Regions:
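Post-Walker A helix-loop "phosphate-sensing" segment adjacent to the P-loop in P-loop NTPases
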Residues: 78-89, 119-120
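Conserved P-loop NTPase "ATPase switch" module shared by AAA+ and STAND
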Residues: 137-161
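The catalytic "switch" region of P-loop NTPases
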Residues: 155, 165-235, 239
Length: 274
């Protein structure tokens, strides 16, 4: 029997599958944990557990595009935010994960939130009516945390529109007494600076590009444990680590795509290692 000790025990059974199935396995979404991601997850959990009070703390997660921000919040949602029915037969949604409207628009924000409840609404309704519906559903479903992805999109629009949508977010935070988490590129910080009150409510956490160091080598070793290759590639070795860092630029999403494509080539060629 072959020794697949270079693969995580949870994935070793994949090695019994055909090459076609192993190629399909590479395209499946998979969580690769690392220190910064775990710290952000801990911060999200801490926010979710905060007792309700006026002026709830909030968080803005920023980083380069395709560098793992959305993956982290979706992982958090999968672990802590899925809807369920409680003992009283109430539909509970602990976390609402929504996407900011494509431009700064208060009505568009409410519509984006209503979509997450699969609730009927009329886009032609007044902004005030949509706001009321959002607040009612948040209370009825006992929402404890609101996450808004693509937060930097709120920069698109006039200064007046930006103020309106940020004031709407502040109102939701105050009215519902829940933390709000924004996720976006570094430009998202400019959204907060439109008003000192907004900036004071949000802590900012940065998800930087990876430096070429031991942490990057540890990341490569973690990736390798999820690659269904019959031979060890030893991706963490300095020469390979330097090469992958140079090609990916330290961008996590680019690194993941690169490793997947290299693994596919290794399977298809029969080399079975990178």
């Amino acid at each position: 029997m072959s020794d697949f000790s270079h693969i995580h025990p949870d994935f070793q059974h994949i090695m019994a599958l055909s090459a076609k199935d192993r190629l399909a396995f590479l395209d499946e979404p998979r969580w690769i944990g690392y220190d910064t991601a775990r710290l952000i997850m801990d911060s999200l959990n801490a926010l979710m557990d905060k007792p309700k009070r006026p002026r709830m703390p909030s968080l803005l997660i920023v980083g380069e595009s395709n560098n793992g921000k959305t993956t982290i919040i979706r992982r958090f949602y999968d672990l802590c935010g899925k809807a369920y029915v409680n003992d009283d037969a109430d539909a509970i949604k602990p976390v609402i994960l929504a996407e900011a409207p494509p431009s700064a628009d208060e009505k568009g924000l409410y519509i984006s939130l209503l979509e997450r409840f699969f609730a009927p609404y009329r886009a032609s309704d007044s902004t005030a009516k949509l706001r009321y519906q959002v607040i009612h559903l948040f209370r009825a479903c006992q929402v404890r945390l609101l996450v808004i992805d693509e937060f930097h999109s709120l920069l698109t629009g006039t200064a007046t529109k930006q103020r309106e949508v940020m004031n709407a977010i502040k109102l939701l935070c105050n009215e519902l007494c829940i933390p709000i988490v924004g996720v976006g590129t570094r430009e998202a910080v400019r959204v907060l600076h439109s008003d000192p009150q907004h900036a004071s409510r949000f802590d900012v956490v940065s998800l930087p590009l990876w430096a070429l160091n031991k942490d990057f080598q540890k990341l490569l070793a973690s990736f390798e444990k999820a690659l269904p290759l019959k031979k060890a590639s030893r991706l963490h070795q300095p020469e390979l680590a330097s090469l992958f860092h140079a090609i990916s630029g330290g961008n996590l999403g680019d690194l993941h795509r690169l490793l997947v494509e290299c693994s596919k080539a290794a399977i298809e060629s029969g080399e079975e290692c990178i």
